[in-house]
Structures are given as C-alpha cells and as structure tokens.
Regions:
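Hydrophobic, Leu/Ile/Phe/Ala-enriched alpha-helical segments that form helix-helix packing faces
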Residues: 8-12, 70-71, 110-112
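Alpha-helix boundary/capping detector
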Residues: 34-35, 73-75, 117
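Hydrophobic transmembrane alpha-helices and their immediate junctions
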Residues: 50-90, 124
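Long extracytoplasmic/lumenal interhelical loops at the membrane interface
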Residues: 1-51
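Transmembrane alpha-helices of multi-pass inner-membrane enzymes
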Residues: 85-90, 99-133
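Alpha-helix termini
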Residues: 34-36, 65, 110
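Membrane-interface micro-motifs in multi-pass membrane enzymes
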Residues: 40-43, 48-55, 95-105
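N-terminal low-complexity, intrinsically disordered patches enriched in charged
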Residues: 30-32, 61, 106
C-alpha cells in the first residue's frame, strides 16, 4: 500500500487539491500501474481525494465530538457503545474505513445522532431498555 500512497502524494501537488479535493469522481495518477485511479484504500486519503481537508476535518470532528459526548457525557451503555463505534470509525480511517453506502455506516451515523442527543444521553440504562426495547 505504501506505493499507492506515494503515488497519491506525488499527484496531489496543488493546495487546491488538498483543500477541496478532486470531486466525487476525482482521480489520481498511479505510477505503478501507469494509469489513473479513482479510489484509494486508505480511508482518510479517500476523503481527501473526494473533498479535501474541508471534507476530512468536519467528518473526523463530528465523529470525535460524538465519541466525547456519548462516552463521557452520557449515563447509559447505549450511548457509550455508539460512542466507541464512532471512535472506531475514526481509527479505521487509516487502514481502510472510507465511507460507503452500507449498513455499517448507517449505524455509525445513527450513533452520531444518539451520542449528540441530550434526550438519549440523560437516560439511564433502565430507561433506555424501556424506551428502545
């Protein structure tokens, strides 16, 4: 994967590429295969390719804020579990973890909602069980 990342870094030369990315269908030149690629295996670089730092930074900030709210400001295991899932998504951005339209990422964004909702954070474990189940 190191060669793929090096190809990405060498092709993303301008500040505009890093700030705004190359769009949803953006591509970068990969010297190892002598062709342009539209995806990269590393999650945070995939976000940079699509929308630049203006896409990556808010994405990570929302997930980290959700982790802190859900883990440290909640009174129940429901929020704490979603908070850990949000943190795992941030950690997972390095080895792979780029956003996709699938059930896992749907659950992550439900977790963002739950962790940032005072309504859920104020409930204790018994109230969560009554409310959800």
């Amino acid at each position: 994967r190191g060669g793929v990342e090096q190809g990405f870094y060498s092709d993303m030369k301008s500040d505009e590429d890093w700030m705004f990315g190359r769009g949803w269908f953006g591509r970068y030149y990969e010297p190892a295969i002598m062709d342009y690629r539209s995806d990269i295996e590393t999650g945070y670089l995939a976000l940079v390719l699509r929308g630049g730092l203006f896409y990556l930074v808010p994405y990570v900030a929302i997930l980290i804020l959700s982790f802190f709210n859900g883990y440290f400001r909640s009174r129940n295991l429901f929020c704490k579990s979603f908070a850990i899932l949000c943190l795992m998504q941030v950690v997972n951005l390095y080895p792979y973890g780029w956003p996709a339209f699938n059930f896992y990422h749907f659950v992550v964004w439900v977790g963002v909602w739950v962790c940032n909702s005072k309504k859920f954070r104020r409930l204790d474990n018994i109230q969560i069980a009554e409310y959800c189940f």
